[in-house]
Amino acid sequence: MKSLTIAALLAVALTPMAKADTADGAALTAMTWDQIVDQARGGTVNWFMWGGSDSINQYVSGYIGGILMADYGITLNRVGITDTVEAVNIVLGEKQAGVSDSGAVDMIWINGENFRTMRQGDMVWCGYTDALPNNTLINWNNPAIANDFGVPVAGCEVPWSKSQFAFAYDSATLPNPPKSIPDLIAWIKANPGQFTYPAAPDFNGGVFVRHVFYYAAGGAENLLGPFDQAKYDAAASKTWAILNDLEPYLWRKGDTYPTSITALDQLFANKEVSMTFNYDASQFGLAVQNGSFPETVRSYGLTDGTISNTNYTAIPFNSPNKAAALVLQNLLLSGPAQVEKAMPAAWGAAPAIEIARTKPEDQAKFATITQLPSVVSMEDLGKSALPELQADWISAIEQGWIRNVGQ
């Protein structure tokens, strides 16, 4: 339940473990679930995850950490990071140094490019998901679950939540927000200084740029599949032209960009800009609840669609506490934990499991959840959901923005 710094964890990464075989993935997958739980009891799990939301942090450290300690005697160390690549780089450095079973990272909240990097570098533990009792709640036949930004999951990570990009505005001051990318472009020019977006490599800023990229390409369907340089070049030239043309109309005339989604939210809260956005619409509700945003904030998707994805948890190849990480993953998938996560007061995140496969009492609780007025429903968003691109595309777009727009 406590949160440790990265430096502190690295300092103890090579400390011998009380149960050394909890690092042996092959041995664990040969055990029964009860045997895995016995191996995990009294242990520790170091979970590296984005730490920018107090509500998410409380859900993880308080609710999840409390259950782990009460039911299994497992200590959950939530390690807050600003970008998932920080955790990936720790594992990469350990792999290069030959640290094969005493790594500092036991689990990562992850998807997209970072998962691809771990798969390509043989840095993620695979082949264990069938050992999780709650794996039966996952619909692995759903391509949006079985593939992470076009990369097959292949038993190398476990879904945690679903999310879809949404825009937010204050209905008291902006009664009719722009509802499509071309409308947004026109609105920005008609309202100079009232819009901006975080610079790459910020995750949410990158997603906004991809929406413009989809528009420039004539639709997401023209970009699906493996990276295609010719298709990229055609869409990229149009995208950079659009964004550079918009720059003088942005906040501070585009001379500077927010460095993070947190910074953009602060500009919105201070009424310096009229809109913000997030890949997790529940964040708008949490901001209203904690007083950061006014109660008149509302959110929505675009008529031409917004990008959606699934996020996951993954266990590095050299985690010394794999048994405890498995118990944590199984708990995160459970009906009660997914219900609590979906509660607006806790987080409001959409479940990654099939609700119909949960126990009747959990299904009943899901049915009673009412989303906050500031949070657009996943049902409404889902009517115009756009797929994510494969990771090679995302890397190219991010680097292209830095070279052609950001510099």
Outline where the language-model segments fall:
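Extracytoplasmic/periplasmic substrate-binding proteins
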Residues: 251-318, 365
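Short, polar/charged alpha-helical segment
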Residues: 33-41, 45-75, 167
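Mature extracytoplasmic/periplasmic domains
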Residues: 306, 311-380
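Gram-negative bacterial Sec-dependent N-terminal signal peptides
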Residues: 1-20
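Conserved C-terminal helix/tail region of periplasmic/extracytoplasmic solute-binding proteins
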Residues: 21-33, 266, 372-407
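Extracytoplasmic ligand-binding site segments that recognize negatively charged/polar headgroups
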Residues: 50-63, 79-86, 101-262
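Short, well-structured alpha-helical segments in soluble
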Residues: 91-100
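Short, hydrophobic alpha-helical packing/hinge segments within bilobed ligand-binding/sensory domains
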Residues: 87, 115, 264-265, 325, ...
